[in-house]
Amino acid sequence: MALAKLYLVTGDQKYLDQAKFFLDQRGYTSRTDEYSQAHKPVVQQDEAVGHAVRAAYMYAGMADVAALTGDTAYIHAIDRIWDNIVGKKYYITGGIGATAAGEAFGKNYELPNMSAYCETCAAIGNVYVNYRLFLLHGESKYYDVLERTLYNGLISGVSLDGGGFFYPNPLESMGQHQRQPWFG
């Protein structure tokens, strides 16, 4: 995302090329794991996997590169990933990232209530992804997801008085989940 912004500010193609290069290395390095979304090349990815925050930021970067280059392989890949998230890995509250183990996306339709992780930071990343996809496609469905995430999955992470913070945002609690003091 930062390199795409730097390209937009400076007009220097090397920044956009560098952003695409970093993304294109996924699936081709010695580290080829799902946790870091490096299990296969980004243009072949079709499922949200691994660490949810890292994934969301990478998907936002993919949307930036897709929009700025017009690369149809990138556009199709990010569309497939978005369909997977919204259709199979998205909570009614707008949360993403079902499991505390690895702070990660779970399997398709793995959406527990009591142990839902739904990290606040993943919700922020999901807002970024949907904003960029709206700019890319101009379809309201992206803003529908953005708004649900913003008003239910993101804002819920902060207490009404601003003094407490939820790192994870489970859907169900029997009193065991408490907001932590603000990290500041």
Language model segments and positions:
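Glycan-recognition and catalytic cores of secretory/periplasmic carbohydrate-active enzymes
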Residues: 1-184
